[in-house]
Amino acid sequence: MKETIAQHLLDIEAVTLRPNDPFTWSSGIKSPIYCDNRLTMGYPHIRQSIAEGFEQLIRSHFPEVTVVAGTATAGIPHAAWVSDRLQAPMVYVRSKSKGHGKQNQIEGKLSSKDRVVIIEDLISTGGSVIQAADALREAGADVLGVVAIFTYGLEKGQDQLEAANLPSYVLTDYPTLLDVAIRRGDISEEELQKLQKWRENPSSQSWMNE
């Protein structure tokens, strides 16, 4: 499954590898990779593979789930498709409460008896997932963990998820993506070294001199 999903993401350029012309993230970090998993919505066969993968992960690791929660906005469509496959209720979680109406941060029906799995499109530093988990826990729900399409596997993200008591499982990951990309000829050996070096210390720009 990991290789298949990685191939899908590369095929539609949901993940773009550009070590010789790096992207600048909103945090200011220079990155050789950019991920926009929202593009998967436009490909029915790919989003079906993702939904099937999520269903397998949830049934395997979180069989006691009663509610599926999508993170706004990218996790919402995938949460809808997965909750349909599981025949489970769905909610979604905003990054912050609305400034009008009932000022809800969580949309949908949730009770203190619910056991929730969060659906995310990408795990980077883990901040958005933890924010969603905090909101769900404040509402009284038992947050079992998170499943995501892809992760950079950054040490900071892994540490923060562990500290927040959030087990996480992904459909594919950074090493798998690089393996697929080098085999397909999408990147050279020199570019592979830069990509590997970046993940060791994303806040440093030393990888650009590899």
From Swiss-Prot:
Amino-acid positions noted as binding 5-phospho-alpha-D-ribose 1-diphosphate in the UniProt annotation, renumbered to this chain: 94, 98, 100, 120-128
InterPro entries: OPRT (IPR023031), Or_phspho_trans_dom (IPR004467), PRibTrfase_dom (IPR000836), PRTase-like (IPR029057)
Enzyme Commission identifier(s): 2.4.2.10
Binding positions for orotate per the UniProt entry: 124
Cofactor requirements of the protein: Mg(2+)
Gene3D superfamilies: 3.40.50.2020
Transmembrane segments: none
Metabolic or biological pathway, per its Swiss-Prot or TrEMBL entry: Pyrimidine metabolism; UMP biosynthesis via de novo pathway; UMP from orotate: step 1/2
Annotated CDD domains: PRTases_typeI (cd06223)
Catalytic activity: orotidine 5'-phosphate + diphosphate = orotate + 5-phospho-alpha-D-ribose 1-diphosphate
One GO MF term: magnesium ion binding
Biological process according to GO: 'de novo' UMP biosynthetic process; pyrimidine nucleobase biosynthetic process
Coiled coil: none
SUPFAM superfamilies, sorted: PRTase-like
Keywords of the record: Glycosyltransferase, Magnesium, Pyrimidine biosynthesis, Transferase
PROSITE patterns for this protein: PUR_PYR_PR_TRANSFER (PS00103)
Enzyme class: transferase
Oligomeric and partner information: Homodimer.
Biological role: Catalyzes the transfer of a ribosyl phosphate group from 5-phosphoribose 1-diphosphate to orotate, leading to the formation of orotidine monophosphate (OMP).
Family to which the UniProt record says this protein belongs: Belongs to the purine/pyrimidine phosphoribosyltransferase family. PyrE subfamily.
Protein name stated in the entry: Orotate phosphoribosyltransferase
The organism of origin for this protein: Halalkalibacterium halodurans (strain ATCC BAA-125 / DSM 18197 / FERM 7344 / JCM 9153 / C-125)
